[in-house]
Amino acid sequence: MEKKNYIVAIDLGSSNVVVAVAERDAEGRPAVRSIVSKPSQGVKAGMITNIEQVSNSIKAAVEAVGEELGIRITEAYTGISGDFVRCARHTDHVFTSDPQNGVNRTDVEALFDRMRNVQAPDDETIMERIPQNYLVDENQEVADPVGSFGKRLASTFNFILCAKTPIERLNLALRRLGIRSLGMYANALVTGAAVLSADEKEEGAAVVNIGGGVTDVA
């Protein structure tokens, strides 16, 4: 597979495994070239229960799209869903470095650094850290704090966590097929980002994705 041209995504569900391949144009913009869906076995409610069946299911979909496009898939992005994926919120703050001249990017990065230091429980991993809001001096909520005047910058982050076991099992299935995982994402988060506009997110719209064993709400 020509790494510079193709982007591959694998979505392993309880009833189907879907492989999508996009090709980058000269300006780096992706365009979908192929989407293949095959029945999946060995998955229950998003959790891999039989590694042999799952490997064979992924292999069937990967080989089908590979034959169609004349490529060999060796790396891919993957999605994951199940009741082992959850959200948790954490609020923290920093004091601004130069209150007279307003909040700067360094202050925001310092706040992000504090959030990066938040640790997940031993049996979970943090998949995403997403700022929900910013609060300047505890009374001024802003979407982008840079330039706002204040001594204290706070934020509440939404943490997307996933149990380690399903991640390890999915990575094992990929390794058995010689596929390197480029990144793993919560399906609900990716679906919401792809389908909802910025205004819809602000207004509280939701996307409901009903699968064979898992229903995601974003």
What name fits each language-model region?
Residues 203-218:
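Glycine-rich phosphate-binding loop of actin/hexokinase-like ATP-binding domains
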Residues 1-16, 20-207:
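Nucleotide/phosphate-binding catalytic cleft detector across ATP-hydrolyzing
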